[in-house]
Curated annotation (Swiss-Prot):
Pfam families: Aconitase_C (PF00694). Its EC number is 4.2.1.33. Catalyzes the isomerization between 2-isopropylmalate and 3-isopropylmalate, via the formation of 2-isopropylmaleate. It comes from Oleidesulfovibrio alaskensis (strain ATCC BAA-1058 / DSM 17464 / G20). This is 3-isopropylmalate dehydratase small subunit. The gene is leuD. Heterodimer of LeuC and LeuD. It catalyses: (2R,3S)-3-isopropylmalate = (2S)-2-isopropylmalate. Pathway: Amino-acid biosynthesis; L-leucine biosynthesis; L-leucine from 3-methyl-2-oxobutanoate: step 2/4.
């Protein structure tokens, strides 16, 4: 899996209420949630996002309350990948469960700036910054995570396994 897009950089400790404020939790529709993605950080933030852009976070991205709406909002805004210094653990699990690709890169997140053009090679654990020429190595995801992501998240993955008699 390779993803190409423009970096949409946010800071440290971006909580789930910044990603999708509680007032927008009246739906689970990805398009509606995506239209309000990062509204708790900056009004209209999502208007700069193009389909396929890559969110780049700082430390502890996705902290705060556990809400599946947050990764759905990011996906609904058209961003299939979040690269960050680190993730809050509950957000990390929720993200993969919803089909959002999350990659931790530690201090290398500081080498990516808003507007940089990126390629993220999930299978080989490589992020190429075409703006600066930097190549960042990261651990590739384990095969079972690829299987979950390929199916669009944990629920579709389990449904398929149950239907096939594998579970």
């Amino acid at each position: 899996m390779q993803y190409n897009g423009t970096a949409r950089k946010v800071g440290d400790h971006i909580d789930t209420d910044a990603i999708i404020p509680a007032r927008f939790l009246v739906t689970t529709d990805p398009a509606q949630l995506g239209a309000n993605c990062m509204e708790g950080l900056e009004h209209g933030w999502v208007s700069r996002v193009q389909q396929g852009d890559i969110m780049v976070g700082g430390k502890n991205f996705g902290c705060g309350s556990s809400r599946e709406h947050a990764p759905i909002a990011i996906l609904g805004a058209g961003m299939p990948v979040v690269v960050a210094h680190s993730f809050a653990r509950i957000f990390y699990r929720n993200g993969f469960n919803m089909g959002l690709i999350l990659i931790e890169i530690g201090d290398d997140a500081d080498r990516i700036h808003d507007g940089d053009v990126l390629s993220v090679d999930v299978e080989n654990g490589r992020i190429t910054n075409h703006t600066t020429g930097d190549v960042i190595s990261c651990p590739p995801l384990p095969p079972f995570m690829h299987d979950i992501l390929d199916k669009g998240g944990l629920v579709p993955y389990v449904r398929e396994r149950l239907a096939a008699g594998d579970a």
